[in-house]
Design a protein with these regions (language model features):
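Bacterial N-terminal signal peptides that target proteins for export
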Residues: 1-7
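Alpha-helical and His/Cys-centered functional microenvironments
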Residues: 10
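C-terminal motif of bacterial Sec signal peptides marking the signal peptidase cleavage site
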Residues: 16-19
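Compact, glycine-rich, soluble single-domain proteins
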Residues: 21-146
């Protein structure tokens, strides 16, 4: 009986630990082209499904430099993101349907404050905080969309 309880407890704990692992999504290289023609690439997870967009980078403690997450929406709209349950500081670029970066904002870990696009956009690209600034990427630059 004790052996059965031990096996059950071990399996339960193992299942619990594995279910806490952050979900990863398909990755595509996203090219960003600055207005001066310089190009940069981000290995971005693609969040297209509502459940993937809603979860985003929640619970991720480490997001390596040069990686990110591209959120794809069905239509242009005012977008709003927050950092609930997100421990890693991020920067977000709001991108219109033509691939033009319209806004870039830094976001605070765990904050529930809404970071709202100033115009209707179709995409959002989150990267580790400071990545856009470090690479000289600004509003008006373009993303080559997948």
């Amino acid at each position: 009986m004790k052996k059965s309880i031990l096996i059950f407890t071990t399996l339960f704990l193992l299942t619990s630990v594995l279910s806490c692992k952050p979900k990863t999504l398909p990755v595509k290289d996203i090219k960003i082209v600055r207005q001066d023609g310089s190009e940069f690439t981000v290995a971005a997870e693609i969040a297209e499904k509502p459940e993937d967009r809603n979860h985003g980078f929640m619970e991720r403690k480490n997001i390596p430099d040069g990686t990110g997450m591209l959120f794809i929406f069905e239509k242009d709209q005012i977008l709003s993101f927050w950092m609930k349950n997100t421990p890693h500081p991020l920067s977000i670029a709001y991108i219109d349907s033509k691939g033009k970066i319209r806004n870039i904002f830094d976001m605070t870990p765990y904050s529930t404050a809404s970071i709202v696009s100033t115009v209707s956009v179709r995409y959002a690209l989150e990267v580790p905080q400071g990545w856009y600034k470090k690479n000289g990427i600004t509003e008006g630059d373009s993303i080559l969309l997948p």
